[in-house]
């Protein structure tokens, strides 16, 4: 269980600070469930999630892990879908983003950037889906690295 003040990675929200732990305070909630009250670091708003949620929630990486990851970036293999096709790529990228693993996100960014560079050299464009998942992966990875460092 996390404590108030902890920095956590919560699903698609990215890095959040645990503001408090307690009942939701909403009228339709019976008050029998305990919630984390989270504040995303890089956007406004508040997120309430049950303590026993199935959504991925983990502490941010340590400063040492962040520095090791940055040092290992040139050697990371690119992450790309095993199968061809838009649907396979979308499912592959979606699963990587949901896992919130920094090394996998960095490898995914590397793969999409290489794909973009190849497309530019050949007068083509990268798909909107690739651009959308690249943005999500960059936001998650860079946000967590910034919070850790």
Predicted regions and their residues:
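Short, solvent-exposed secondary-structure boundary/capping segments
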Residues: 24-35
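Conserved hydrophobic positions within beta-strands
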Residues: 16-18
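A short macromolecule-binding patch
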Residues: 37-52
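Loop/turn positions that initiate beta-strands
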Residues: 5-6
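Charge/polar-rich, low-complexity and marginally structured segments
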Residues: 52-149
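A generic structural signal for short beta-strands and their flanking turns/coil linkers
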Residues: 14, 32-34, 43-45
């Amino acid at each position: 269980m996390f404590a108030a003040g902890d920095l956590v990675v919560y699903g698609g929200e990215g890095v959040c600070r645990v503001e408090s732990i307690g009942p939701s305070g909403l009228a339709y909630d019976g008050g029998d469930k305990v919630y984390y009250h989270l504040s995303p670091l890089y956007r406004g708003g508040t997120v309430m999630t049950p303590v026993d949620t199935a959504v991925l929630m983990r502490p941010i990486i340590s400063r040492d892990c962040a520095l090791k990851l940055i040092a290992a970036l040139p050697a990371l293999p690119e992450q790309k879908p095993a199968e061809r096709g838009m649907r396979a790529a979308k499912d592959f990228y979606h699963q990587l983003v949901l896992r919130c693993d920094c090394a996998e996100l960095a490898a995914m960014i590397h793969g999409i950037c290489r794909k973009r560079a190849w497309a530019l050299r050949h007068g083509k464009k990268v798909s909107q889906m690739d651009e959308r998942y690249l943005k999500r992966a960059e936001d998650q990875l860079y946000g967590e690295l910034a919070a850790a460092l």
